[in-house]
Amino acid sequence: MSSKLQNITVLGATGSIGVSTLDVIRRHPDRYRAFALCAHSQVDKLFEQCVEFRPRFAVLRDASLAATLSERCRSVGLDTEVRYGVEALIELSSLPEVDAVMAAIVGAAGLEPTLAAARAGKKVMLANKEVLVMAGELFMHAVREYGATLLPVDSEHNAIFQSLPADFARGLESCGVQKILLTASGGPFRNSPLADLANVTPEQACAHPNWVMGRKISVDSATMMNKGLEVIEAHWLFAAPPDMIQVVVHPQSVIHSAVQYADGSVLAQLGNPDMRTPIAYAMAWPERIAAGVEPLDLFKIARLDFSAPDFERFRCLQLAYDVLREGGTAPAILNAANEVAVAAFLDGHLPFLGIALLNEAVLQAMPAGPEGSLADVLAADAEARHLAGQLIRQQRFA
């Protein structure tokens, strides 16, 4: 066990991954310190976290929110320095004092600080899949060039990481890997009549059967866009060609993913659906620590079911495979369109089935370019968001 206290910057501290990360830190105060806590706009929740964990820094979206938090911290004698904006996120992901960064900001907003952490050679615990979806080539190049340690936190990719040999970077085929089996619950609508999907409400879409998640990722799970993004993420994390990544619908969410080998073996990681398990694994790797998760009781499982995904029902999953094969900025365009589509659905401005239709319309209208630089990626992201917003305002899919 390492005797050095690890300073951790938590990007997305008030979200579900951030809260679970802080729970693991709470259980191991002799190993980890919450050095910087970064959130979007939840002042009350971030203040409570600052009181408990006493970070050196806290970050919020804008100056007004930061001023409110700063005043509240001073009123209780906290010396936490409160900052705001993207530049603060970038700085607190790359300071020399920082040992590890939990990258858990949802969506494209997490790209720049997570890339900064990689370029600073940090241990990057990656929960933000959009970083690899938008800029996989740039990000993986930074990880290699600057000697960062990259550990996946998504339960599926963490399971794959655990099921691969330690030297998988020399090439999956060289390691005897035939397939990466990426499991998916199928979301709340996997068995719903197709006619019923036209009337799905945000509340129904956010009611995931197995996992406790934020609203955006819950909707992505319901459309299986989440799994599509994870296919792209797996491609970059493990240098796996698209045809090597097979999505398997597994409603119980007990097998978190698996790897099929040339000798007929299939190695899988099993566990109760609790994000503290992959978080604790990433934090302590290559060691293992208690995560507060109830052990899996094999006698209570009773059965495990598996099926192939329905690409007609889950059009977003097919779109993800399509943009992965196309390459360049196509994945960034899909991600941007989807973020706008999901936000519109949650706000009542787009029907559930309109999410996939809008994503496809943006991809058809906007040609992909090369992923040459961060500026290219951000420009494609901005253009796709603008186009998606226009289509929604025109009520093309109402």
Swiss-Prot record:
PANTHER family: 1-DEOXY-D-XYLULOSE 5-PHOSPHATE REDUCTOISOMERASE, 1-DEOXY-D-XYLULOSE 5-PHOSPHATE REDUCTOISOMERASE, CHLOROPLASTIC. This is 1-deoxy-D-xylulose 5-phosphate reductoisomerase. NADPH binds at T14, G15, S16, I17, Q42, N128, E130, G214. Pathway: Isoprenoid biosynthesis; isopentenyl diphosphate biosynthesis via DXP pathway; isopentenyl diphosphate from 1-deoxy-D-xylulose 5-phosphate: step 1/6. It catalyses: 2-C-methyl-D-erythritol 4-phosphate + NADP(+) = 1-deoxy-D-xylulose 5-phosphate + NADPH + H(+). The keyword Membrane does not apply. InterPro entries: DXP_reductoisomerase, DXP_reductoisomerase_C, DXP_reductoisomerase_N, DXPR_C, DXPR_C_sf, NAD(P)-bd_dom_sf. Mn(2+) binds at D154, E156, E230. Its cofactor is Mg(2+); Mn(2+). Keywords: Isoprene biosynthesis, Manganese, Metal-binding, NADP, Oxidoreductase. One of its GO terms (biological process) is isopentenyl diphosphate biosynthetic process, methylerythritol 4-phosphate pathway involved in terpenoid biosynthetic process. Catalyzes the NADPH-dependent rearrangement and reduction of 1-deoxy-D-xylulose-5-phosphate (DXP) to 2-C-methyl-D-erythritol 4-phosphate (MEP). GO terms for molecular function: 1-deoxy-D-xylulose-5-phosphate reductoisomerase activity; manganese ion binding; NADPH binding. It comes from the Bacteria. The keyword Manganese applies. Its EC number is 1.1.1.267. 1-deoxy-D-xylulose 5-phosphate binds at K129, S155, E156, S185, H208, S221, N226, K227, E230.
